Amino acid sequence: MGNPGNVVRRRMSGPERRRQLLDVGRATFAERGLDGTSMEEIASRAGVSKPVVYEHFGTKVALYREVVAEEMERLENVIADSISRGRSRARIERAVVGLLAYVEDHTDGFTILARDPVSNQGFATLLGNATGRVSHILGAAFSRAGLDESPAVLYSQALVGMVSQTAQWWLDERTSQGLDKETV
């Protein structure tokens, strides 16, 4: 019978350790930004030595880029899945709720994408792509209704901008305002 005071710790595999460092890095970058984060802090929070972090990523910027790439892919998938099927209005509503669900479920990732100037270019590109997709959806809906399609570009810019800004506001205010994503 083992001593209950002795805890046997299993050593993490390389992929498990990498995943842990990405998760710790994401949380730290969201809290402090790229410039305010050090590899020492990431190592300390992960309970490893600094050389272990460098072994997996080489540099702080490389770790940051990988975190940003994961979050961009995750958010792109949310948007793409939301607008891939259904009627125009339902597709856009699903995209809005999908974005808010992403903010709720991946707060650190959204904070990095939307607020850190280093990753903001990628977020701007993602919003530009979303605007293009929404423009096509609105243009097709306008055409089916016998309306001029040309305002679709303007309306899509307004809609995507409004939703993006609302998501950033909700990130800060959802708890104090008591607002869930369905209400927003």
Predicted regions and their residues:
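Basic, helix-initiating cap at the start of DNA-binding domains
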Residues: 1-32, 36-47, 62-65
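Short hydrophobic/aromatic patch on the recognition helix
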Residues: 47-57
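Alpha-helical DNA-contacting segments of helix-turn-helix folds
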Residues: 62-71, 78, 123-126, 130
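Hydrophobic alpha-helical connector segments
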Residues: 66, 77-107, 155-159
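Amphipathic alpha-helical packing segments from all-alpha helical-bundle domains
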Residues: 73, 120-144, 153-161, 165, ...
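Amphipathic alpha-helical segments used for helix-helix packing
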Residues: 100-124, 135-139, 165-172
